[in-house]
């Protein structure tokens, strides 16, 4: 069992979830975060920290959102681990994607933090 970052995180990346994770299971992409399901201990501490409700238990995933679980697993193997809170992405206040739009916008390229 694990928690999953879904579409609501795309182009937001608040990172408040990162500071409370006891096992450092968050990984950072260019425009979203993911959780490594092999590291997540299902503690649920991160879920209420997300101001856009992008984090959910895999047990509560809707059928149409199950691809996010696979995405989290895949990208957590190639993106860098994030342990420090950062500012949200510029313009996050205006992000209002449908789940399909978010899926199209999510970057799958390896992320290089230049800050």
Put a short name on every predicted segment.
Residues 5, 14-38, 45-63:
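Iron-sulfur cluster-binding cysteine motifs and their immediate structural context
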């Amino acid at each position: 069992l694990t928690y999953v970052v879904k579409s609501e995180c795309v182009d937001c990346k608040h990172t408040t979830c990162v500071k409370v994770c006891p096992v450092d299971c968050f990984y950072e992409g260019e425009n979203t975060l993911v959780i490594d399901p092999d590291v997540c201990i299902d503690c649920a501490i991160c879920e209420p920290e997300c101001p856009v409700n992008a984090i959910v238990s895999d047990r509560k995933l809707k059928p149409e959102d199950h691809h996010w679980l696979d995405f989290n697993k895949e990208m957590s193997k190639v993106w860098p681990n994030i342990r420090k809170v950062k500012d949200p992405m510029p313009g996050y206040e205006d992000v209002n994607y449908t789940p399909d739009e978010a899926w199209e916008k999510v970057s799958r390229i390896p992320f290089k933090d230049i800050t």
